[in-house]
């Protein structure tokens, strides 16, 4: 049930009947205060201006024509022409019944789209670090959300698996006479990488050999390809451990690295030349874009092939967008890449559109995000200024959560303690990020994220456990609750209305790629349940009818909290 969509349709119909253009927007919003009703229609003023009539006069006409019988208890006109809508309690109760009995909490079925989500994208032969965290967990929340709604989601892990570094690594492995690369773990690879780079910088013969291996690798040399595949496999095996620890849904099957598009690059350069979009400039192949200007105010040149014949990231990104439309049949492509890459992506997509590789009907969206900062406001690093490995961050989160939970539950068995610490620690790291607007930088703070108060994962996980425990404590089975829901107390009504706003929330998250909206909703819902729980006795209600009604409200709250947290990739527990 999407109340906002229902009211938008009703108010739009009334606006049209009142003489407004057919495309007039109702602008339905959830009311900030109960005195203004449950929803407000704010579109009357803009429409009245177009029609050249007083807004309040149009609002009165719209209210007369509004068909909200059985949905709204009353409507009121406020100020210059706002329409406040007060929902009918019986109608809200009936919609809660529907949500409880229907699959997926009563969500309206969507028209399924094929949506490609580009996220995580670590580099081969390097261990994942905290810089990969935001893309990985925000992108995964988007994938889970869209999949839950019923879309066909294709996860694309655009790993950095191509380039000169592989020539260096293969050359160094050969130098060390270590062809048994399959037994290396990633920490060895990182050490190899550092040594290979040192040799590359210091030894001209080595550098020449490394460059030769790059050419051989690009030419399909079997020995080089075999070594390259080992490096990729070792890296992705290690990354998979991190993904599973993070409760992220990416698998090895989702890897679509840069190398996937190699065979497309010569054809794309030739095609862009043939279309007159790319030209030779100082030996390189360049696309000049009028949409972007250089410092002299001239069209900016985007290089797609270097003088030496090598290709650039832009060329790969053009091929990648083309592939996602032509081969994956994408209706929508979401890129979870940090904000520093914005201009680069926009330039690639401008070329893609001009070349006709992806039609305007297919949405290409950069869901950019800010940086992860330490308490000092600088990029989050080790005390020595180094990059923090993701595995080390997860280890520290687990240790901190274990200590905290052990202090609160000294009698808890060690196995249970360990399992709970895993769920709480991973939830804390993910929720701390997901609860902030992705477009802003955010400060990483252990104390805040592991707190059991405020908008944190431990608080939300506890909120779910608290609701679920009501049923466990009383030994109540869901199917034993047969009495209808009644909403006689204002707190019952407020909780019920907020429960019905789950679809509006998840629809917004799916449209904008903003999981913090879901976090805010769940935190608000937990707060409303807390007020309801304290003031409306559930197990000790005045009658069995009221008891069952309140238990059913509690049941939908538990289901909504659990499902909402699941779309964020955060697990719940039955006991805390």
Curated annotation (Swiss-Prot):
<keyword id="KW-0963">Cytoplasm</keyword>
<keyword id="KW-0648">Protein biosynthesis</keyword>
<dbReference type="GO" id="GO:0005524">
    <property type="term" value="F:ATP binding"/>
</dbReference>
<comment type="similarity">
    <text>Belongs to the class-I aminoacyl-tRNA synthetase family.</text>
</comment>
<dbReference type="Pfam" id="PF05746">
    <property type="entry name" value="DALR_1"/>
</dbReference>
<comment type="subunit">
    <text>Monomer.</text>
</comment>
<keyword id="KW-0436">Ligase</keyword>
<keyword id="KW-0030">Aminoacyl-tRNA synthetase</keyword>
<keyword id="KW-0547">Nucleotide-binding</keyword>
<feature type="short sequence motif" description="'HIGH' region">
    <location>
        <begin position="122"/>
        <end position="132"/>
    </location>
</feature>
<dbReference type="GO" id="GO:0004814">
    <property type="term" value="F:arginine-tRNA ligase activity"/>
</dbReference>
<dbReference type="InterPro" id="IPR014729">
    <property type="entry name" value="Rossmann-like_a/b/a_fold"/>
</dbReference>
<dbReference type="InterPro" id="IPR001278">
    <property type="entry name" value="Arg-tRNA-ligase"/>
</dbReference>
<dbReference type="Pfam" id="PF00750">
    <property type="entry name" value="tRNA-synt_1d"/>
</dbReference>
<dbReference type="InterPro" id="IPR036695">
    <property type="entry name" value="Arg-tRNA-synth_N_sf"/>
</dbReference>
<protein>
    <recommendedName>
        <fullName>Arginine--tRNA ligase</fullName>
        <ecNumber>6.1.1.19</ecNumber>
    </recommendedName>
</protein>
<dbReference type="Pfam" id="PF03485">
    <property type="entry name" value="Arg_tRNA_synt_N"/>
</dbReference>
<keyword id="KW-0067">ATP-binding</keyword>
<dbReference type="InterPro" id="IPR009080">
    <property type="entry name" value="tRNAsynth_Ia_anticodon-bd"/>
</dbReference>
<dbReference type="InterPro" id="IPR008909">
    <property type="entry name" value="DALR_anticod-bd"/>
</dbReference>
<dbReference type="InterPro" id="IPR005148">
    <property type="entry name" value="Arg-tRNA-synth_N"/>
</dbReference>
<dbReference type="GO" id="GO:0005737">
    <property type="term" value="C:cytoplasm"/>
</dbReference>
<dbReference type="InterPro" id="IPR035684">
    <property type="entry name" value="ArgRS_core"/>
</dbReference>
<dbReference type="GO" id="GO:0006420">
    <property type="term" value="P:arginyl-tRNA aminoacylation"/>
</dbReference>
<dbReference type="InterPro" id="IPR001412">
    <property type="entry name" value="aa-tRNA-synth_I_CS"/>
</dbReference>
């Amino acid at each position: 049930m999407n109340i906002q969509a229902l009211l938008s349709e009703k108010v739009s119909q009334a606006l049209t009947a009142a003489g407004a253009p057919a495309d007039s927007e109702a602008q339905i919003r959830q009311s900030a205060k109960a005195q203004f009703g449950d929803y407000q229609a704010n579109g009357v003023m803009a429409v009245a201006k177009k029609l050249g009539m007083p807004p309040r006069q149009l609002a009165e006409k719209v209210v007369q024509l509004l068909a909200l019988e059985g949905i709204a208890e009353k409507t009121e006109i406020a100020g210059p022409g706002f329409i406040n809508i007060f929902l009918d309690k019986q109608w809200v109760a009936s919609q809660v019944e529907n949500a409880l009995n229907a699959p997926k909490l009563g969500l309206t079925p969507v028209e399924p789209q094929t949506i490609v989500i580009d996220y995580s994208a670590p580099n081969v032969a390097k261990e994942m670090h905290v810089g990969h965290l935001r893309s990985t967990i925000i992108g995964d929340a988007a994938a889970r959300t869209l999949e839950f709604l019923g879309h066909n989601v294709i996860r694309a892990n655009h790993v950095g698996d191509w380039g000169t570094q592989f020539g260096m690594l293969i050359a160094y492995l050969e130098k060390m006479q270590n062809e048994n690369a399959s037994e290396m773990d990633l920490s060895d690879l990182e050490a190899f990488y550092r040594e290979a780079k040192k040799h590359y910088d210091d030894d001209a013969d080595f550098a020449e050999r490394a460059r030769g291996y790059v050419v051989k690798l690009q030419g399909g040399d079997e020995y080089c390809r075999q070594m390259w595949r080992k490096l990729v496999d070792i890296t992705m095996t290690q990354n998979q451990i991190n993904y599973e620890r993070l409760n992220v849904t990416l698998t090895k099957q989702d890897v679509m690295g840069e190398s996937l598009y190699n065979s497309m690059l010569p054809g794309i350069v030739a095609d862009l030349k043939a279309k007159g979009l790319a030209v030779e400039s100082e030996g390189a192949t360049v696309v000049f874009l009028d949409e972007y200007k250089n410092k002299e105010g001239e069209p900016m040149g985007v290089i797609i092939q270097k003088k030496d014949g090598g290709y650039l990231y832009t060329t790969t990104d053009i091929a990648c967008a083309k592939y996602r439309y032509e081969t994956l049949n994408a209706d929508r492509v979401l890129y979870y890449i940090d904000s520093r890459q914005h201009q680069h992506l926009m330039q690639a997509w401008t070329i893609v559109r001009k070349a006709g590789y992806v039609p305007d009907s297919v949405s290409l969206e950069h869901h950019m995000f800010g940086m992860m900062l330490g308490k000092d406001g600088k990029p989050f690093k080790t005390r020595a200024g180094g990059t923090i490995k993701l595995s080390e961050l997860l280890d520290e989160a687990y240790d901190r959560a274990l200590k905290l939970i052990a202090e609160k539950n000294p009698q808890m068995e060690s196995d249970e303690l360990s399992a709970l610490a895993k769920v709480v620690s991973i939830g804390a790291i993910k929720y701390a990020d997901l609860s902030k607007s992705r477009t802003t930088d955010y400060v990483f703070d252990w104390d805040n994220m592991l707190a059991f108060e405020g908008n944190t994962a431990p608080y939300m996980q506890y909120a779910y456990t608290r609701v679920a425990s009501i049923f466990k404590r009383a030994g109540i089975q869901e199917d034993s609750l047969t009495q209808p829901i009644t909403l006689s107390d204002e707190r019952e009504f407020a909780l019920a209305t907020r429960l019905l706003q789950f679809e509006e929330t998840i629809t917004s998250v799916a449209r904008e790629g903003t999981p913090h909206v879901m976090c805010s909703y769940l935190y608000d819902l937990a707060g409303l349940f807390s007020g309801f729980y304290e003031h409306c006795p559930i197990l000790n209600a005045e009658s069995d009818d009221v008891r069952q009604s309140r238990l059913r409200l509690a049941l939908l709250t538990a289901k909504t909290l659990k499902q909402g947290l699941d779309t964020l990739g955060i697990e719940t527990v039955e006991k805390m």
